[in-house]
Swiss-Prot record:
Organism, scientific name: Acinetobacter baylyi (strain ATCC 33305 / BD413 / ADP1)
Keywords: Cytoplasm, Ribosome biogenesis
Function per UniProt: Required for maturation of 30S ribosomal subunits.
Subcellular localization: Cytoplasm
UniProt record similarity statement: Belongs to the RimP family.
Recorded superkingdom: Bacteria
CDD domains linked to this entry: YlxS_C
Family annotation (InterPro entries): Ribosome_maturation_RimP (IPR003728), RimP_C (IPR028998), RimP_C_sf (IPR036847), RimP_N (IPR028989), RimP_N_sf (IPR035956)
GO biological process assignments: ribosomal small subunit assembly; translation
Protein name: Ribosome maturation factor RimP
Single GO cellular component term: cytosol
Length: 174
């Protein structure tokens, strides 16, 4: 789980602007697409279990948790201004800002720690036991050794080096 140099540079550039909007920068995807690239920014904020539901300025009920439309608008405006000034992306691009959603992608190993015991989808760089794709239960996140442990098919436990993870996301289960 390593960011490309381009993505890391974009992350470092926009992180202060995102934090100034009172949200956390969950991750960035930069996808070159011919003439028009895509910069997708995922934002999140901690859950406030004690918050009472309130009506926001748009008349929408907010439960004191999660990302709302106004959060996305604020971040889009702040980040858009920074990108206009620094111009780190050559050519045209679309800017998308959203929450990570129910099937949240993981960009850093630390992010997975909160989801131990849940199902994750993994795409690996190099095959492990002749497979590059897994749906598995997350058993352990070892930050010191930079690895995870997952249970595949309800019985088989694998240890996977975090540097071998190309893509990982949570599998939403009702």
């Amino acid at each position: 789980m390593k960011l490309s140099n381009k993505t890391q540079a974009l992350h470092d550039l926009i992180a202060p602007a995102v934090q100034a909007c009172d949200v956390n920068l969950w991750g960035i995807e930069f996808i070159p697409q011919g003439k028009r690239s895509l910069l997708r920014i995922f934002i999140d904020k901690p859950v406030d279990e004690t918050a009472e539901p309130v009506l926001n300025e748009d008349g929408e009920t907010e439960l004191g948790r999660g990302i709302g439309v106004q959060d996305c608008v604020r971040v889009t405006q702040q980040v858009g201004a920074i990108l206009d000034v620094h111009d780190p992306i050559s050519g045209e691009y679309a800017l998308e800002v959203s929450s990570p959603g129910w099937d949240r992608p993981f960009f850093q190993l630390e992010q997975m720690s909160a989801y131990i015991g849940q199902q994750v989808a993994l795409r690996l760089i190099s095959a492990v036991e002749n497979r590059r794709k897994f749906q598995a239960k997350l058993l352990l996140v070892d930050l010191e050794n930079e690895m995870i442990q997952v249970e595949v098919d309800g019985k088989h436990v694998l240890e996977i080096d975090s540097h071998n993870i190309d893509k990982a996301n949570l599998i939403y289960q009702d």
